[in-house]
């Protein structure tokens, strides 16, 4: 069984500048700097997750997470978390080895592989939730709106929930079309696999708790090892 599962796929975007250092006609090193937005989802509780525990958090009046110490929820608005959609911005530095064919007509084809180092600049989440009230006398929950439905809270600051750095393996292929002289347009497709957990350590996420037994709440140890497929195009000169 599963405790967590992949949520909805996200469509991100980015832009940047690259530098190529040519070793010879067919081999070069590509690096530079680019900005990107990564989007992905994680399911914390649904009928398909047979091992899932109910997960809770509390927000203050400014919709910031409130740290949860002890077994009773802290003061604030209490919610059960069902699904979380991440929107994380990064500054990325690629280090890529690029292997090119000789020019065929006006086209040069290439494959490339290497790594990308990303530094987080901002993280937001959209949470699918249910508002709750908690009765300390019998450790029970009740729906605070008397409605059996889920709601959304958008753009909650999630810097404490996500790692500051990500490391990705990069594999791609593409083509360059020569316009004139040293000026070409290019398009390429890359697959990135990020080797470290997107989410922070449980002790750093002190505001998120799962109920392991009635009235007993422990830290959530969710893991998300994401990847993405990137379609790029631009101008070389």
What do the PLM-derived regions correspond to, one by one?
Residues 223-237:
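Outer-membrane beta-barrel "beta-signal"
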Residues 5-73:
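Glycine- and aromatic-enriched membrane insertion/assembly motifs of diderm outer-membrane
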Residues 1-18, 164, 208-214:
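Surface-exposed strand-loop-strand hairpins of Gram-negative outer-membrane beta-barrel proteins
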Residues 7-12, 83-90, 103, 159-168, ...:
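Short sequence motifs at beta-strands and strand-loop junctions characteristic
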Residues 1-3, 74-82, 150-159, 212-218:
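Extracytoplasmic loops and strand-loop junctions of Gram-negative outer membrane beta-barrel proteins
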Residues 12-16, 92-96, 110, 170-172, ...:
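Membrane-embedded beta-strand positions in outer-membrane beta-barrel channels/transporters
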Residues 100-206, 237:
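Outer-membrane beta-barrel transmembrane domain signature
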Residues 4, 46-55, 126-135, 202-211:
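Flexible, surface-exposed loop regions and adjacent strand-edge segments
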């Amino acid at each position: 069984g599963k405790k967590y599962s992949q949520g909805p796929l996200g469509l991100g975007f980015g832009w940047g500048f690259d530098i190529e250092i040519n070793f010879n006609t067919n081999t070069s090193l590509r690096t530079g700097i680019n900005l990107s937005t990564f989007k992905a989802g994680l399911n914390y509780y649904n009928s398909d997750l047979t091992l899932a525990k109910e997960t809770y958090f509390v927000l203050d009046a400014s919709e910031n997470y409130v740290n949860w110490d002890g077994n009773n929820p802290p003061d604030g608005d209490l919610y059960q978390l069902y699904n979380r959609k991440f929107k994380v911005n990064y500054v990325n530095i690629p280090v890529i080895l690029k292997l090119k064919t000789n020019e065929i007509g006006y086209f040069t084809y290439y494959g490339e592989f290497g790594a990308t180092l990303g530094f987080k600049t901002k993280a937001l989440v959209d949470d699918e939730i249910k508002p709750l009230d908690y009765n300390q006398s019998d450790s029970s929950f009740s729906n605070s709106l008397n409605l059996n439905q889920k709601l959304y809270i958008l753009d909650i600051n999630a810097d404490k929930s996500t790692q500051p750095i990500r490391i990705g393996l990069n594999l791609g292929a593409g083509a360059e079309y020569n316009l004139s002289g040293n000026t070409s347009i290019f398009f390429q497709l890359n697959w990135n696999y990020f080797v470290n957990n997107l989410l922070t350590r449980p002790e750093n996420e002190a505001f998120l708790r799962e109920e392991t037994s009635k009235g007993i709440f422990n830290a959530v140890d969710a893991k998300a090892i994401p990847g993405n497929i990137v379609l790029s195009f631009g101008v070389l000169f």
